[in-house]
């Protein structure tokens, strides 16, 4: 309810972005969705982009990074932008560097006043996995102030496939009943939450 959607669209991450296609060395068709928003209270306008880069094509990821920035200029050269998604590369890859090296965008992780990231963003459905790699990113125009950044690593518990059993817990009051459940993640990626100010 805070924003009005002025315009929206999609384009393909390929050499022919206006036509359904697979780009460069990618193995799957990939798109980027975008919206032009206006804040009802302040009149502030911005572009929001969300994409899913290819998981195999290295050239496709780099070229997609350049293409998205071209589209930002085409759709609103004077408008600040937010770019989110599963980039399928971490902060060491050349496509990541292509997004942050020219001053058009900055990584909200690097820019945040307060950061909570005890793990990376990909977990492969295993809550015990740990990585420092962040493959899900939130890039923003320099105009935005990044107040907070967080990788939310919450898990939930469900009964094991073999059934529930009483947990072997020592020094537990007899009034407490604890069953041995399994920790699970809602997705193979952890969500990223960012608080921005403009």
Predicted regions mapped to residue ranges:
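Metal-dependent phosphoester-hydrolase catalytic domains
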Residues: 3-6, 63, 72-81, 89-198
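Hydrophobic pocket-lining residues within nucleotide cofactor-binding pockets
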Residues: 13, 51-53, 87, 144
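Generic anion/oxyanion-binding catalytic loop in active/binding sites
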Residues: 24, 57, 182
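His/acidic metal-ligating clusters that form di-metal
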Residues: 29-49, 58-99
């Amino acid at each position: 309810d805070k924003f009005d959607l002025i315009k929206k669209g999609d384009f393909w991450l390929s050499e022919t972005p206006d036509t359904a296609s697979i780009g460069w060395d990618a193995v799957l068709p990939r798109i980027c969705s975008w919206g032009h928003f206006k804040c009802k209270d302040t009149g502030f306008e911005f572009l929001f982009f969300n994409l899913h880069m290819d998981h195999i094509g290295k050239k496709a990821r780099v070229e997609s990074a350049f293409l998205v920035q071209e589209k930002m200029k085409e759709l609103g050269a004077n408008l600040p932008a937010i770019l989110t998604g599963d980039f399928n590369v971490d902060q060491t890859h050349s496509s990541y560097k292509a997004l942050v090296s020219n001053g058009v965008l900055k990584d909200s992780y690097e820019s945040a006043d307060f950061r909570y990231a005890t793990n990376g963003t990909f977990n492969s459905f295993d809550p015990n996995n740990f990585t420092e790699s962040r493959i899900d990113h939130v890039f923003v125009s320099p105009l935005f102030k990044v107040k907070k950044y967080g990788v939310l690593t919450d898990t939930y518990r469900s009964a094991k496939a073999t059934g529930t059993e009483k947990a072997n817990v020592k020094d537990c009051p007899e009034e407490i009943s604890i069953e041995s459940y399994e920790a699970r993640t809602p997705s193979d990626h952890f969500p990223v939450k960012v608080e921005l100010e403009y």
